[in-house]
Swiss-Prot record:
Top-level taxonomic group: Bacteria
Domain J positions: 3-93
Name by which UniProt lists this protein: Adaptation to cold protein J
Region (Essential for interaction with AtcC) residue spans: 74-94
Length: 94
């Protein structure tokens, strides 16, 4: 399960304004139009990361979705720690 808080680089206690600021900062960072001189591969990776950022913002900016995410995230049982670590690693180094 992707941790939307980690994607945006914020704490679970973040306020709505902090969520917006993180979203704006990251969407500017990963937007393809901002990546002048980047290779096609780098642009593709940035595009994938931008989609993660958009999804995280969509979930965390809506109070109902945010509460459901927190509830579900707290109920996740890690059955394969290696897989969980790979997923976490891939969030930061796609």
């Amino acid at each position: 399960m992707i941790n939307h808080f980690s994607v945006l680089g914020i704490k679970p206690s973040a306020k709505e304004d902090d969520i917006k600021k993180a979203y704006r900062r990251l969407s500017n960072k990963y937007h393809p139009d901002k990546l002048l001189g980047a290779s096609d591969e780098e642009k593709e990776q940035a595009s994938q990361q931008l989609e993660r950022v958009k999804k995280a913002y969509e979930v965390l900016s809506d109070p109902k979705l945010r509460n459901a995410f927190i509830r579900d995230f707290n109920n996740v049982i890690v059955t394969d720690p290696n897989s969980a670590m790979r997923e976490l690693w891939d969030q930061f180094y796609p």
